[in-house]
């Protein structure tokens, strides 16, 4: 599912869940440096832990969305309880905390319930972007 498609349906989800996109990043001009998206720590996590998210090289003053998701039954199952938006500063950077969950009731970006997600067995990730740019995805592992 493309990020552009997901953003059109964001009103039902509350924010765009950016799970397994990448088309927007692939379509970017080669003249622009790719943005950097990092999560620390990303492994050995525990339920309810706060992780530090850092973004650089993105567009200045843009709103992006971030969500914890996992592929479940061929669909993206995101956590609507923690999905949120953030805005980059004048240099295209942002730093903030995000609470990760080991398990949650997953929903598609359209808001359709998908079922339970258990990040101990499902391949969970934290992804960020908007309809014009995929900032990236970081795999999450729980200890």
Swiss-Prot record:
Magnesium recorded as keyword: no
InterPro entries: Neocarzinostatin-like, Neocarzinostatin_fam
Keywords: Antibiotic, Antimicrobial, Disulfide bond, DNA-binding, Signal
UniProt signal peptide: 1-33
GO biological process: defense response to bacterium
Disulfide bonds: 69-78, 119-124
Function according to Swiss-Prot or TrEMBL: Binds non-covalently to a chromophore which is the cytotoxic and mutagenic component of the antibiotic. The chromophore binds to DNA as a weak intercalator and causes single- and double-strand breaks.
Stored NCBIfam families: chromo_anti
Name under which the protein is recorded: Actinoxanthin
Organism: Streptomyces globisporus
Taxonomic classification: Bacteria, Bacillati, Actinomycetota, Actinomycetes, Kitasatosporales
Gene: axnA
């Amino acid at each position: 599912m493309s990020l552009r498609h997901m953003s059109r349906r964001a009103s039902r989800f509350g924010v765009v869940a950016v799970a397994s996109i990448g088309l927007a990043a692939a379509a970017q001009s080669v003249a622009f440096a790719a943005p950097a998206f990092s999560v620390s720590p990303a492994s050995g996590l525990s339920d309810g832990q706060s992780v530090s998210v850092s973004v650089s090289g993105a567009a200045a003053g843009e709103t992006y969305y971030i969500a914890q998701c996992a592929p479940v039954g061929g669909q993206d199952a995101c956590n609507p309880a923690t999905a949120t938006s953030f805005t980059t500063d004048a240099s295209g950077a942002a730093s903030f905390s995000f609470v990760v969950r080991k398990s949650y009731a997953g929903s598609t970006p359209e808001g359709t319930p998908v079922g339970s997600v258990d990040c101990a067995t499902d391949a969970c990730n934290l992804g960020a972007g908007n309809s014009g740019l995929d900032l990236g995805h970081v795999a999450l592992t729980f200890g």
